[in-house]
């Protein structure tokens, strides 16, 4: 697939050639994670049917689950009204999306008020990350 496809040109890429991506679990609608894609990542995601992101720290394509086996099977791809955010509806293989071993990267919830509040961990570790990433 050409990374110059018309549908790729519709996406409003940022100054670094990236677009923010939200991965949402199909069925439960749980928000699993936030990541980035470049044109190649989005094209390969469509080609393979599995989520492939752009790692800003490693500066390379990142096939979600390439090390852990916790891949994301893509059921649906949506573009928001401003055409600058992508939503992936995915099946999370192994039920673990976060590198901390949790189901979702959004496992901290703000509790309390503006003066006395703090972030509380509200989701358990499903698998020790040391055993996931050897």
Swiss-Prot record:
GO terms for biological process: L-histidine biosynthetic process. Its cofactor is Mg(2+); Zn(2+). It is found in: Cytoplasm. Zn(2+) binds at residues 81, 98, 105. Pathway: Amino-acid biosynthesis; L-histidine biosynthesis; L-histidine from 5-phospho-alpha-D-ribose 1-diphosphate: step 3/9. It catalyses: 1-(5-phospho-beta-D-ribosyl)-5'-AMP + H2O = 1-(5-phospho-beta-D-ribosyl)-5-[(5-phospho-beta-D-ribosylamino)methylideneamino]imidazole-4-carboxamide. Keywords: Amino-acid biosynthesis, Cytoplasm, Histidine biosynthesis, Hydrolase, Magnesium, Metal-binding, Zinc. InterPro entries: PRA-CH, PRib_AMP_CycHydrolase_dom, PRib_AMP_CycHydrolase_sf. Its EC number is 3.5.4.19. The keyword ATP-binding does not apply. Mg(2+) binds at residues 80, 82, 84. Homodimer. PANTHER family: HISTIDINE BIOSYNTHESIS BIFUNCTIONAL PROTEIN (PTHR42945), HISTIDINE BIOSYNTHESIS BIFUNCTIONAL PROTEIN HIS7 (PTHR42945:SF1). Belongs to the PRA-CH family. This is Phosphoribosyl-AMP cyclohydrolase. It comes from Janthinobacterium sp. (strain Marseille) (Minibacterium massiliensis).
């Amino acid at each position: 697939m050409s990374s110059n496809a018309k549908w790729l040109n519709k996406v409003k890429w940022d100054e670094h050639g990236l677009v923010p991506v939200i991965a949402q679990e199909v069925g439960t609608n749980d928000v699993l994670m936030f990541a980035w894609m470049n044109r190649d990542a989005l094209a390969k995601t469509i080609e393979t049917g599995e989520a492939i992101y752009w790692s800003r720290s490693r500066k390379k394509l990142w096939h979600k689950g390439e090390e852990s086996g916790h891949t994301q099977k893509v059921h649906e791809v949506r573009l928001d009204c401003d055409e600058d955010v992508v939503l992936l509806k995915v099946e999370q293989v192994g039920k673990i999306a976060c590198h901390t071993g949790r189901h979702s990267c959004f496992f901290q919830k703000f509790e309390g008020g503006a003066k006395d509040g703090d972030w509380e961990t509200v989701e358990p570790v499903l698998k020790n990350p040391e055993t996931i990433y050897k």
